[in-house]
């Protein structure tokens, strides 16, 4: 009879479902074993790590993240600038409150790198486990195919690597679509950024931002991206601007305005080139890095901490943890020269770094290293939108232009007003390091694109100035 055949089909489906699940379980366990073994081999014989273990595990089981992340409360940090430091600060704070907080500090913020991060985790049964993951904007949607975060933290979106991301609204669509795959997850985003309030999302949202100045009618600089009202396309006005297009914005034509803030920075009590003190939601905090952009990173991390009910004293301790992050104002001593290494990758970030450097109370020399590999962004036209002209006003005694595109960097600095007698071009990093030793000042700022940072750190490690040259963190 037809219903007997139907029952047979149903029974076969159950059998294949169970058997298939068993096979998938075996595949996952085998993938994990291969990944962990390759990690051990890399650390034992090559003294370092990479995303290779994750790549191998994914080749065996494309759904391996399902198995690895299922016991974690996952927090995802994404955006153009500030991901790395915001992730580090968030991890530092949560570790004051929770026993097990996993993160990806080695620059592996794409899918295979995330898998490698989970492969490194030690078993912690019976404890509340967090994973705070920095994820590349273009990779978010791929990662959320397999991981279901409970919280997304959006830092900002600025023009960056146009050959990879396109314009800012394309990038925003990328991360909104990635977050939508976990529709119940909360998005905590920068309320001072108009783009984060430009479209409705399926996810619930909260906002952090600055509320530290009296209202004063202002307009963003004419070359600023993202200042058109998303509703009527008139130019936004501001009652307060922190930098670029961030601030207390509103549209005089249609009434579009900054949303109510859930987490508020109400005062900056001190800020220089190496530190900042401020008040968030009535509590005083400080960080051991300078610049307005880093205060935003601290505010974002504090917002996540408040969401998880971390007490203010533990937030304070986590923010004050003085361990410099890869390329984020890390200080490296080279034969008596105190070199501050800063990653730069787009005009907004560069301008914030220039503003921060301008706060230095002591004389310094400058090194600018420019590469144009895929991870840097092949299009280097962005250097012409950066305010290098400010360097000409700082009376810097010596400047080095280096990296694979040293000639382009030198041209930009000359056009900005750096005198030729103060400027030296040096392509090879071994020569750059030798030239740094001869600079006339004790303090040196090194501004470098991503792969230039990696190459410089590798060479510094080879010469014994640092450990773990190619790794971040």
Task: Label every model-predicted segment.
Residues 209-347:
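Adenine nucleotide phosphate-binding catalytic loops in nucleotide-utilizing enzymes
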Residues 81-83, 108-109, 193-194, 294, ...:
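Gly/Ser/Thr-rich loops at beta-strand to alpha-helix junctions
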Residues 4, 8-228:
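Phosphate-binding loop of NTP-binding sites
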Residues 100, 150-151, 185-186, 204, ...:
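Residues at the starts of beta-strands that form the adenosine-phosphate
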Residues 134, 155, 188, 297, ...:
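Residue-level signal for inorganic ion chemistry
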Residues 90, 94, 114-118, 298-308, ...:
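Buried hydrophobic packing segments
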Residues 3, 9-43, 48-50, 233, ...:
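ATP-dependent carboxylate-amine ligase
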Residues 86-87, 141-143, 163-164, 197-200, ...:
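Short glycine-/acidic-enriched loop or helix-start segments at secondary-structure transitions
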């Amino acid at each position: 009879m037809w219903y007997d055949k139907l029952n047979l089909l149903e029974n076969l489906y159950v059998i294949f479902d169970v058997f298939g699940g068993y096979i998938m379980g075996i595949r996952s366990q085998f993938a994990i074993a291969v990944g962990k073994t390759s990690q051990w081999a890399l650390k034992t014989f090559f003294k370092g790590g990479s995303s290779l273990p994750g790549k191998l595990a994914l080749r065996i089981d494309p759904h391996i993240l399902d198995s690895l992340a299922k016991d974690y409360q996952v927090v995802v940090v994404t955006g153009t600038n500030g991901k790395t430091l915001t992730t580090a600060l968030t991890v530092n704070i949560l570790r004051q409150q929770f026993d097990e907080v996993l993160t990806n500090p080695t620059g592996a913020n794409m899918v295979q790198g995330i898998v490698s991060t989970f492969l490194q985790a030690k078993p912690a049964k019976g404890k509340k486990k967090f994973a705070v993951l920095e994820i590349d904007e273009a990779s978010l949607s791929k990662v959320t195919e397999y991981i279901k975060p409970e919280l997304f933290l959006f830092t900002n979106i600025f023009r960056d690597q146009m050959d990879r991301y396109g314009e800012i609204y394309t990038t925003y669509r990328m991360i909104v679509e990635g977050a939508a795959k976990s529709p119940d997850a909360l998005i905590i985003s920068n309320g001072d950024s108009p783009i984060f309030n430009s479209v409705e999302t399926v996810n619930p949202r909260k906002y952090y931002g600055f509320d530290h100045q009296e209202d004063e009618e202002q307009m963003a600089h004419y070359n600023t991206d993202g200042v058109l009202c998303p509703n009527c396309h008139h130019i936004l006005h501001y009652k307060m601007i922190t930098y670029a297009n961030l601030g207390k914005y509103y549209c005089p034509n249609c009434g579009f305005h900054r949303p109510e803030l859930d987490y508020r920075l109400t005062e900056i009590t001190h800020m220089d080139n190496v530190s900042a003190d401020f008040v968030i939601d009535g509590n005083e905090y400080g960080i051991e890095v300078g610049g307005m952009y880093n205060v935003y990173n601290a505010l974002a991390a504090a917002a996540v901490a408040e969401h998880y009910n971390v007490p203010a004293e533990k937030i304070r301790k986590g923010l004050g943890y003085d361990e410099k992050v890869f390329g984020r104002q890390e200080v490296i001593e080279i034969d008596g020269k105190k070199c501050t290494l800063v990653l730069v990758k787009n005009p907004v970030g560069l301008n914030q770094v220039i503003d921060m450097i301008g706060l230095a109370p002591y004389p310094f020399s400058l090194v600018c290293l420019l590469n144009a590999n895929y991870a840097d962004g092949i299009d280097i036209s962005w250097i012409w939108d950066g305010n290098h002209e400010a360097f000409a006003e700082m009376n810097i005694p010596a400047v080095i232009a280096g990296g694979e595109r040293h000639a382009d960097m030198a041209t930009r600095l000359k056009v900005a007003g750096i005198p030729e007698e103060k400027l030296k071009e040096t392509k090879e990093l071994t020569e750059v390091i030798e030239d740094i030793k001869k600079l006339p000042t004790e303090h040196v700022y090194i501004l470098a694109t991503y792969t230039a940072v990696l190459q410089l750190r590798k060479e510094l490690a080879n010469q014994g100035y640092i450990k773990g040259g190619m790794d971040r963190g």
